[in-house]
Amino acid sequence: FLGKEPQGVLTPEALANAQGVELLVTSAYAGLASPVEGYDPYQASPFNWVWGGIYGGDANKGSDPNDQSTVNEIELYNTLSTNGYIKQKWVWVYQMSKRVNLALQVLENAEDMKEEIRQMRKGELKFLRALAYFEGMRVFGVYLPYIDETNQENDPKVHNDKDIYSLVVADVDDAIANLSDDPEVVGEVGRA
């Protein structure tokens, strides 16, 4: 009974086709605008009202002190490690990375994709991963655990003792090299 495959589960093998890749790429994009694992978009959004506008001094929280009081800590540069906005930003970075990495793993095994579309999707995914880690570097610094599609889930060998800036730049360079401006390849408006 321990060898039974769970029912109702989408495996990477089941998604290793053109349609599955498109679904996974859409899932990666969805992390930009919708909650990932229950986070509040105010707390972790890459649009950065809190971690850009408030933290950078371009915006004020406003309202009264009891309304999103944890934002006051960020605005006053007095953020405690228990501040939920910090946790949610961390979760967002790694949930985005996980979505992108799964899509990249499946993309390599999808045999029914046209090569130019495969390269375009790879470029989009590399851009999204670079964005996620860039957001992480803005809040946590450049020494973050960098997880890419070659890492196994729960890999104990992922360390945070290396500056990941060059890895993020490499993802951006890969994205630029693979993205296309051909409407037939791009597909939907609004993609990277």
Give residue ranges: language-model regions.
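Acidic helix/loop microenvironments that form the catalytic cleft of cell-wall polysaccharide enzymes
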Residues: 190-192
